Amino acid sequence: MQESINGNLSEERISGAQQPEAWNGAPVNGSPEQQSASGAESNQLRFQSSLSDSERERQKATDLEHRRAAFARHFGCAPGSEKHVESYSSFDEKDTRVQLAEFYRFNDGHLKKWGYF
């Protein structure tokens, strides 16, 4: 499935309909028509890590920073440690799981609005 030089997506869809391929780019019928320069078949699985370690650590640090800011907005003070930031996450209106009452203030606007207490 090759895209044309000018980037026409309709040609890509047409060629994809003519040659069905698996998610890793191998032909579905398993024919060894295409071989790489090393001679290995193209239908072998290719390992691709979704995130590198540095990206994963950067995302975790960004997430903790957002939680720390939400903690400070919610409780009006800075958290004592990272443990508090991780355990006392921000209130999510779309989260349908049971929310523990001790994590939130009773006079909070979210709780009054949604009638949890």
Curated annotation (Swiss-Prot):
Q: Where is the composition biased (Polar residues)?
A: 31-52
Q: Which InterPro entries match?
A: Phage_B (IPR003513), Phage_B_sf (IPR038149)
Its biological purpose is as follows: Participates in the assembly of the viral procapsid in the cytoplasm. Forms first a 12S pre-assembly complex with protein H, and F and G pentamers, then twelve 12S complexes are joined by the D protein to form the procapsid. Internal scaffold protein B is released from the procapsid upon genome packaging. Autoproteolytic activity cleaves protein B and probably facilitates its removal through the pores of the procapsid.
Q: Which Pfam families match?
A: Phage_B
Cite the post-translational modification comment. The proteolytic cleavage of the internal scaffolding protein B releases the scaffold protein in order to continue virion assembly.
Q: Where is this site: Cleavage?
A: H74, F75, S90, F91, R105, F106
Protein name, entry field: Internal scaffolding protein B
Q: List UniProt keywords, sorted A-Z.
A: Autocatalytic cleavage, Host cytoplasm, Hydrolase, Protease, Viral capsid assembly, Viral release from host cell
How it assembles, according to the record, is: Component of the procapsid complex composed of 60 copies of the internally located B, 240 copies of the external scaffolding protein D, 60 copies of each of the viral structural proteins F and G proteins, and 12 copies of H.
Organism per entry: Enterobacteria phage phiK
Q: Which family does it belong to?
A: Belongs to the microviridae B protein family.
Report if keyword Transcription is assigned: no
Compartment(s) of residence = Host cytoplasm
Q: What is the lineage of its organism?
A: Viruses, Monodnaviria, Sangervirae, Phixviricota, Malgrandaviricetes
Please, what other remarks does the record include?
A: Phi KhT, a host-range mutant of phi K, can grow on E.coli C and B, besides K12, and is more thermosensitive than the parental phage phi K.
Q: What ranges does the record list as Basic and acidic residues composition bias? A: 53-65
Q: Name one GO molecular function term.
A: peptidase activity
